[in-house]
Amino acid sequence: MEASPNYLPCDGCGLPASPEHIAERLRRLELSTRYRPVHIGVLFVVLAPSLRLEDDFYGPAESKEFFAPFLDVLEIPPHDEKAAPELDALAIASARLAEFQHRGYYLAYLSECPIPENGEPPATTIARLSPTLIRRIRFNYKPKYIAPLGQELFSLVDLLRVAGFESILTLDQGLALPSPSTGDRGWMDLFQKAVASVPPRDNLSSGYDRIQVTSAERDLRAGGHS
């Protein structure tokens, strides 16, 4: 019988990984590094990237199930046809990612590698990888604010609080923000209000934008209700 390969752990997910797995992990890292801001204003955190490399957020993604509604709700427009009618789909998506970067946004993953279907439950992944994420936040990302995305990150929110990040968490009534879903107007209103509630800082570098709305504008987005 042929012996099982003795694979080393992947530093992205902590699990034994084949050379093919490591190569894909490095490719995802390369894609995300292209759009990482020098100073991260809002760090969005989701559980894991898409299963297909072609659908990686920073690819940019071929599938728009997450990509399009996420950037739409951040009011990063898809394309100005009058200004540049010749742009193709890839160029348009890349321009949106560049604007995402320009605003100081960054999307990070608890597990930097996809979680296979029928893999471990989210709670297990969170318990296993949260110490690594917390180290990355503290010593690498150093964001001004953290916005967890997805209700499956419930236990991660508590761990981030215990780690001392409570004052910079952007939440919905104490919970992680809902993950993007196409056509869900209620989610879009909720997400916009939560991110818009992040107060501006006086020490933002030149050209560094963030969502800043007045109370009146916030009420208008919420349908005119206070």
Task: Please annotate each region the language model reported.
Residues 1-169:
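A polyanion-binding, active-site-adjacent surface
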Residues 14, 176, 225-226:
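Compositionally biased, intrinsically disordered low-complexity regions
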Residues 58, 173, 182-185, 206, ...:
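Feature targets compositionally biased, intrinsically disordered low-complexity regions
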Residues 72-80, 165-198:
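Short, flexible loop segments at boundaries between secondary-structure elements
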Residues 132, 178-180, 193-194, 207, ...:
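Low-complexity, intrinsically disordered/propeptide-like segments
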Residues 139-143, 196-204:
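Secondary-structure boundary elements
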Residues 199-226:
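Extended, charge-rich low-complexity interaction segments
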